[in-house]
Curated annotation (Swiss-Prot):
Induction record: Expression is negatively regulated by the basidioma development repressor lfc1. Expression is positively regulated by the cross-pathway control WD-repeat protein 2 (CPC2). A CT-rich motif, which is often found immediately upstream of the transcription start point of highly expressed filamentous fungal genes, is present at the expected position. One additional CT-rich region is also found upstream of the TATA box in the promoter region.
Disulfide bridge partners, by residue number: C34-C100, C44-C94, C45-C81, C101-C114
Residues the record marks as carrying a glycan: N46
CDD domains named among the record's database cross-references: hydrophobin_I
Phylogenetic placement of the source organism: Eukaryota, Fungi, Dikarya, Basidiomycota, Agaricomycotina
Keyword presence, RNA-binding: no
Entry annotated with the keyword Nucleotide-binding: no
Gene: Hyd-1
Name of the protein described by the UniProt record: Class I hydrophobin 1
Length: 121
């Protein structure tokens, strides 16, 4: 059986495309850990504030509906946060406040029990 160069080229170009389209299940956590001393996840928050500062209008309503007592929270409250996937590697960029949040998170809208991370991202 004889393969032409064009057929061989098509096969060679198709292999990387098929390999990159393969779906593999994720295992473990999707966020970077804050270090060996805490069980929190590294987050990049648009803003952080003290638990004694009143939240802006829509967030204050949400915390009230969820029954969150901000006075009982230790640490900062992170607002509009996204997980930092890998610390120290290219592609990770946090132009706002990088924090480690050890409390509850509500889909990144509100993260509780946060402390600042002192790393260059």
């Amino acid at each position: 059986m004889r393969l032409s160069i064009s057929k061989l080229s098509v096969v060679m170009l198709a292999l990387p495309i098929l390999a990159s389209a393969s779906v593999l299940p994720r295992t473990g956590s999707t966020g970077a850990s804050c270090g060996s001393t805490t069980s929190g996840q590294a987050q990049c928050c648009n803003s952080t504030q003290s638990n004694t500062t009143p939240l802006p209008f829509p967030l204050s309503v949400i915390t009230g509906l969820l029954g969150i007592d901000l006075g009982a929270i230790t640490g900062l409250v992170g607002l509009t946060c996204n997980p930092i996937t890998v610390l120290g590697l290219g592609g990770t960029n946090c132009n706002s406040q990088a924090v480690c949040c050890t409390g509850n998170t509500f889909n990144g809208l509100i993260n509780l029990g946060c402390s600042p991370l002192n790393v260059a991202l």
